[in-house]
Amino acid sequence: MNRLPPTNPARRHFMEIVAAGAGRLSTIAIASSLLAVSRTKDANALGIFPKDDPGTAPHCFGRGTLILTDRGEVPVEDLATGDLVVTANGALPVKWIGLQTMKRNASASWHPSVLPIRVSRFAIDDQTPQRDLYLSQEHCLLIDGVLIPVKYLVNGSSIAFDDDAKMSETIEYFSLELDSHEVVLAEGTAAETFRHWGGQIAWDNLGDYQDLYGSKQEVMSPFAPICRYTGGRAEVSGLLRLAASRFVDVRDPIQIAYDRIAARAVAIAA
């Protein structure tokens, strides 16, 4: 494993994020087990899945996103196979950079699911992101020890759909794949790398990828539990109240993150 200087401030903050989230994982596991005792259709309203299926939407970075490497920050589109990127597990080599380009007719509108989401500078905390971060809607951020799709954090202010992209004729997404599912620093923010889940990949350069690695890919285990709603938020709140304990905080981890980030946006705007 490649190691980086311990004095690197961005990496130090990265490790603080990972360490802070570790203590919350046991709470989430307990909450998940409490909810799992119910076998009704509502019992899975909040999915906390160590082996979650992310669906077929792209999980990617926008063009120009700066990724921390062993030689500093590099735009994601300029990374190449073999480059070392900073992860919680040290500096690991890039396996592939996938490109997905979507185009629209000038007279048509983008489908809402295609539009990127902008995470504004310092939307998460006092240090992250260091600059505006643009992600596909299903792309996960590491918050409180779990991976949360950024679409669940949209508040219309500090985290919002990219209005500029609505007028663009093309939208590009870049996938950063390593040999395993990891979390890297994108604009200083802990964000997931691409994870094979067994579904179909729609990269422009898929043919080149298959020439190197073949068409069959092993499903990757996620770096951390992936949280997503598979039912309504109201259903989740009711289930969590039923599982409430004086000793265990079983609140919805997505709602906790959303509320904290939204409150921060209001405070910054004041």
Please annotate each region the language model reported.
Residues 3, 34, 71:
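Generic anion/oxyanion-binding catalytic loop in active/binding sites
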Residues 59-73, 84-213:
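Long beta-strand-rich cores associated with HINT superfamily self-processing modules
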Residues 77-83:
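Structural motif
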Residues 3, 16-18, 26, 265, ...:
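Short, positively charged, Ser/Thr-rich terminal linear motifs in low-complexity/disordered regions
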Residues 13-37:
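N-terminal export signals
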Residues 46-57, 171-270:
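Sequence-level preference for short, compositionally simple segments enriched
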Residues 1-13:
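N-terminal secretory signal peptides
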